Amino acid sequence: MINEIKKDTQLRMEKSLETFKNHIAKVRTGRAQPSLLDGIQVEYYGSPTPLRQLANVVAEDARTLAVTVFDRSLISAVEKAILTSDLGLNPSSAGTTIRVPLPPLTEERRRDLIKIVKGEAEQGKIAVRNVRRDANDQIKALLKDKEISEDEERKAQDEIQKITDTFVKKVDEVLADKEKELLDF
């Protein structure tokens, strides 16, 4: 029973970490990364469709993304979607390829992005701690129902805390990497 709780806790914390990584991957660093355009939705036959389903996005060089649209008729719609996104990008099309040059980040913008990333990291830690709280509640319920002893409860909570500490540390490591990436120019 306790092992199932630990496995479930580990799985849910991994999902929280992945969600955090996905959120900060969308933060622009000044380097061209295809994941930057992941959140863009293009109007396709009346419904918003993720850009990834309509085009191939690759980093052409350190400061340029190349978007190759599968359907020529969508070039203007894709260009408009990139332009109207809140990323501050200015795409230009050449044939079936749309080039998206990334303007250099100002020092002030870098600081703002670091604040955003730190906020995301805090949300990630909160999610991990919420998973810990749920696991501890399940363990306390087992104790209350007399399915485990107090010693087993204490041991299980210590193990859950170790798992939590590991994931909080991972969130901090990802945050440190992203901050370093933002400050490198």
Swiss-Prot record:
Subcellular location, principal: cytoplasm
InterPro entries: Ribosome_recyc_fac, Ribosome_recyc_fac_dom, RRF_sf
Cellular component terms (Gene Ontology): cytosol
Protein biosynthesis among keywords: yes
UniProt KW rRNA processing keyword: no
Any one GO molecular-function label of the UniProt entry: ribosomal large subunit binding
CDD domains: RRF
Location in or out of the cell: Cytoplasm
Gene3D superfamilies documented for this protein: 3.30.1360.40, Ribosome-recycling factor
Superkingdom of this protein's organism: Bacteria
One Pfam family cited in the UniProt record for this chain: RRF
Keyword terms, alphabetized: Cytoplasm, Protein biosynthesis
GO biological process: cytoplasmic translational termination
Function description: Responsible for the release of ribosomes from messenger RNA at the termination of protein biosynthesis. May increase the efficiency of translation by recycling ribosomes from one round of translation to another.
PANTHER family: MITOCHONDRIAL RIBOSOME RECYCLING FACTOR PSEUDO 1 (PTHR20982:SF3), RIBOSOME RECYCLING FACTOR (PTHR20982)
Record-stated family: Belongs to the RRF family.
Protein name: Ribosome-recycling factor
Gene that encodes the chain: frr
